[in-house]
Amino acid sequence: MSLWGKSKKNMQGLVGLFIFYLALGYQINSMRKVSILGLMSIFSLSILFHLLVIIGIVPSHIVWGGRATNADELMQLEIVSISLNTLFLVFILILNGNIKVRIKPLLAKILLWLMSILFILNTIGNLLAKSSIEKIIFTPVTLLSSVFCLYLALRFLYSKG
């Protein structure tokens, strides 16, 4: 059975990560918290996923629209993806106060808008992918990421709720 045939185990992993974040003290009591927690989870899981692609556990044909032509190109794309997801995760941790770095509100808002646009474009790319797995699994993930970033861009800097 393939990795994707074990959707129940994948779902259990997502639930486990969600419980892990709750155990760390994140309480979901507002849309802001849902957005922050959702983005932290998505970026963390995305980093893990792309590491699994690099080491060969996840088949490479289900990423990058199935268009990576060779191992070198795939590695470059995966490194870019891991780097961007790490930067996004650090940025969200800064916004949430987990990392004590001051960031100007205007810069934060611009970055959130850019992330929203990037995830919308990525959603379109996923819809055009050759792989049905990429369409079915990653289209909702990138769409949700864009919604969370858009919400934070519109509301996060004006209130804490």
Model-derived features: positions:
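Core segments of alpha-helical transmembrane spans in multipass integral membrane proteins
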Residues: L45, L52-I54, A71-G97, W113-I117
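Interfacial loop at the N-terminal end of multi-pass membrane proteins
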Residues: N29-R32, I36, I54-I79, V101
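Membrane-water interface at the C-terminal end of transmembrane alpha helices
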Residues: S145-G161
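Hydrophobic alpha-helical membrane segments
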Residues: A108-G125
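Alpha-helical transmembrane segments of integral membrane proteins, especially early/N-terminal helices
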Residues: S35-F49, T142-V147
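Membrane-helix boundary connector in multi-pass membrane proteins
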Residues: T123-F138, L157
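Polybasic, lysine-rich low-complexity intrinsically disordered segments
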Residues: K6-N10
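Non-cytosolic membrane-interface motifs at loop->transmembrane helix junctions
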Residues: W64-D72, P105, S131-T142
